[in-house]
Amino acid sequence: LQEIWNVLSLGGPTAIPLMIASIFSLAVIIEKTIFFAKNKQDNKNLIRKVEMMIDEGDTMSAYNQLKGKKGPNVKLLSTALSNLDEDSERIREALQVTGQNEIRKMEKHLTILDVIAMIAPLLGLLGTVLGIISSFNILGGAAGIGDPTQISAGIASALISTAIGLIIAIPTAIFYSYFSKIVDRRAHQLNQSIVEIMDVVDGNDRGEKYEENVKNIS
């Protein structure tokens, strides 16, 4: 810790904002890694099984299959089952709202990574400029000759500040890109699931058996 503090102290006035940015970045990276690990894609066999039950009109069995299960597609199917007494357009709207809510959960806090990846190099550059200004002020002192030690410290501060900014920005940008691709891929899969579910729902007349089962569910 002492060595880290020594490096930060050499980084000049922008070192502390950069340190705070690095803490936020690390926290978001850990949070999103855990989130995506816990919320993997749903069991395809379960989804197909439930879709077949809906297709056959056995909504009670489909509802029971989903109890205690988690995942974006499970929530979509639960939404469809809860709205089977509505017309197709209302079911589609309900599915789209559920899908959008799931996407928002996946996107949560990603903006923080985007901002940090953008501002960290700028903060590093600001530290570089301030360090160089400090060095020139010393060099142009009253005697005309500055203290070499102080000049070196100013240059070191400038270089360290730039390095810290890049060290923070590069991995942050990489993780932001990685998480964004996961969100895009899963959003596409959710849209496909909505289409598949609507195909199943529209393929049935949803007659008396559906109405009876929906009443039992509610």
Task: Indicate where each model-derived feature is located.
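Pore-lining and gate-forming transmembrane alpha-helices of multi-pass membrane transport proteins
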Residues: 149-176, 180
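Residue-level signature of catalytic and energy-coupling elements of molecular machines
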Residues: 12, 26, 62, 77, ...
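Membrane-interfacial helix-loop-helix connectors in multipass membrane proteins
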Residues: 139-152
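Alpha-helical transmembrane segments of integral membrane proteins
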Residues: 15-28, 114-127, 168-172
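Predominantly long cytosolic amphipathic alpha-helical stalk/bundle segments
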Residues: 41-126, 130, 134-142, 177-218
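Hydrophobic membrane-targeting segments
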Residues: 1-45
